[in-house]
Amino acid sequence: MSHVISVVSGPAATVELSAAPGQVTIVGSATGLVRLTGQLHWTGHAPITASRLNRVAGVLQLSYRCAAASPCTGNYRLVVPWRTAVVLHQPAGHVVISGLAGPLRITAHSADISATGLRTPSMQVAISSGHMSATFAAAPRHLAVSLTSAQATFRLPAGTGYAISSRVTAGYLQVGIPQVAGAAHNIAVRIDSGELALLSG
């Protein structure tokens, strides 16, 4: 079975997407609307879906969850105004992100994530059993990374120094960027098991 996804909303301060396993593309654009398109596929019972806009908080929540004992997958394309804050929960699959300039928070499991052209002032990432590569077009003020059985590579603009704090239980942290104690730009790293590379350029 399948179902077409089509959600169009006015601008929201934050868009929160809880996706079913599958492919997610998120694009920051010079648009005044939030637009989610795509398709859900499933076997058994239809996925549980919800779209809710909290106008007071300015939060648009988009949720797609497989029903019990009914495997499902999704293919999503989310286009947002480029300064919109984005929160993504991705249980498995492949994620491609480009052009975002608002705060970004990602929680993912068994996912391959690629992000380019980021101008986000802050990013929080928690990945288990997956991989992420991210390239920043502007230096983030705050970056927090948590890895469990995961690998990640972040490329940050040259010429900016960072205050870096880290806790590595099992794994490896490669620091190829300038470290400056007390810098306005800071990076917090927690690696329970995995590898993280912080590189310039």
Mark where each language-model region is:
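Short, surface-exposed interaction patches in beta-rich subdomains
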Residues: 116-201
